[in-house]
Amino acid sequence: MIKSELVQIVAARNPHLYHRDVENIVNAVLDEITDALAAGNRVELRGFGAFSVKNRPSRSGRNPRTGDTVFVEEKWVPFFKTGKELRERLNPGAGDEDDDDN
């Protein structure tokens, strides 16, 4: 699903709202999440999940074309951890979070 499809679905479920207003709301929510992450804050949507940023330290990498060693600078990357309700909905009837693949 892409953002425009999300806007269409939300607008269809809420016929009392104009499509333009739904689009503005979706954009505002995404902008607030982005701004919070850019400020180094964590955004938690209970039951759905939590957005945060993690630091990837600098390291040596390899250019896949040439095989040359290259320096990869430190960077911050977005990270999403699913909430319990989302995990349960995706995996109905699944046991605890512990992975017992034995």
UniProtKB/Swiss-Prot annotation:
PANTHER family on file: DNA-BINDING PROTEIN HU, INTEGRATION HOST FACTOR SUBUNIT BETA
PROSITE patterns: HISTONE_LIKE (PS00045)
GO CC term (a single one): cytosol
Organism encoding this protein: Rhizobium rhizogenes (strain K84 / ATCC BAA-868)
Family named by the database record: Belongs to the bacterial histone-like protein family.
BP GO annotations: DNA recombination; regulation of DNA-templated transcription; regulation of translation
Subunit structure: Heterodimer of an alpha and a beta chain.
Keywords recorded for this protein, A-Z: DNA recombination, DNA-binding, Transcription, Transcription regulation, Translation regulation
SUPFAM superfamilies per UniProt: IHF-like DNA-binding proteins (SSF47729)
NCBIfam families for this protein: hip, PRK00199.1
GO MF terms held by the record: DNA binding; structural constituent of chromatin
Descriptive protein name: Integration host factor subunit beta
Annotated function: This protein is one of the two subunits of integration host factor, a specific DNA-binding protein that functions in genetic recombination as well as in transcriptional and translational control.
Gene assigned in the entry: ihfB
HAMAP family hit by this protein: IHF_beta
